[in-house]
UniProtKB/Swiss-Prot annotation:
Subunit structure: Part of the 50S ribosomal subunit.
Functional note: One of the primary rRNA binding proteins, this protein initially binds near the 5'-end of the 23S rRNA. It is important during the early stages of 50S assembly. It makes multiple contacts with different domains of the 23S rRNA in the assembled 50S subunit and ribosome.
Gene3D superfamilies, per database record: 3.40.1370.10
Family: Belongs to the universal ribosomal protein uL4 family.
Gene Ontology terms for molecular function: rRNA binding; structural constituent of ribosome
Keyword Protein transport annotated: no
Keywords associated with the record: Ribonucleoprotein, Ribosomal protein, RNA-binding, rRNA-binding
Region span, Disordered: 44-71
Cellular component per GO, a single term: ribonucleoprotein complex
GO annotation terms (biological process): translation
Protein name, per record: Large ribosomal subunit protein uL4
InterPro entries, sorted: Ribosomal_uL4, Ribosomal_uL4-like, Ribosomal_uL4_dom_sf
Domain of life: Bacteria
Species whose genome carries this gene: Edwardsiella ictaluri (strain 93-146)
């Protein structure tokens, strides 16, 4: 199959298996959920009655005071006591094998092509690290919510995009299922497309 280059009167021949496969919604959902779960910090923690600071002494005698019986100031019933079912740090990551991950990326890229959300250009750069230059370039292309993927990190482009809302710049190694889905359009250079093909082959 061929992808038309937006900034040149030519087309780029690409693999049908990478950019023309059926959309596997279940697989994409599983991989996206796993990716998001892996990004969780998972460091929350609370203290049980065994861990909170305080004496182990019985606050007052069992009988004769008229007060409710009590055995510890660290009881979960008390203010400043421990938590009954205290949260523990945990690893939320889910296993996704390479074949599934690559399959999900291929499904997403193919769907982007079908929905005309993938824009392929010969090259994409700015002369200087100026936000104004990139903002004007995107305005000329009628783009405002866009992920720009280049074959290698372009420092000028990266610095120019940092202060633009809903604009992100990645190299091929930095793309992931969530970022491909999150943006309205994906602009990819011809070299980046070839690299993606090799990576997912």
């Amino acid at each position: 199959m061929e992808l038309v280059l937006k900034d040149a009167q030519s087309a780029l021949t690409v693999s049908e298996t990478t950019f023309g496969r059926d959309f596997n919604e279940a697989l994409v959902h599983q991989v996206v959920v796993a990716y998001a779960a892996g990004a969780r910090q998972g460091t929350r923690a609370q203290k049980t009655r065994a861990e909170v600071t305080g004496s182990g002494k019985k606050p007052w005698r069992q009988k004769g005071t008229g007060r409710a019986r009590s055995g510890s100031i660290k009881s979960p019933i008390w203010r400043s006591g421990g938590v009954t079912f205290a949260a523990r740090p945990q690893d939320h990551s889910q296993k996704v094998n390479k074949k599934m991950y690559r399959g999900a990326l291929k499904s997403i890229l193919s769907e982007l092509v079908r929905q005309d959300r993938l824009i392929v250009v010969e090259k994409f750069s700015v002369e200087a690290p100026k936000t104004k230059l990139l903002a004007q370039k995107l305005k000329d292309m009628a783009l405002d919510d866009v992920l720009i993927v280049t074959s290698e990190v372009d420092e000028n482009l990266f610095l120019a995009a940092r202060n633009l809302f809903k604009v992100d710049v990645r190299d091929v190694a930095g793309i992931d299922p969530v970022s491909l889905i999150a943006f309205d359009k994906v602009v990819m250079t011809a070299d980046a497309v070839k690299q993606v093909e090799e990576m997912l082959a």
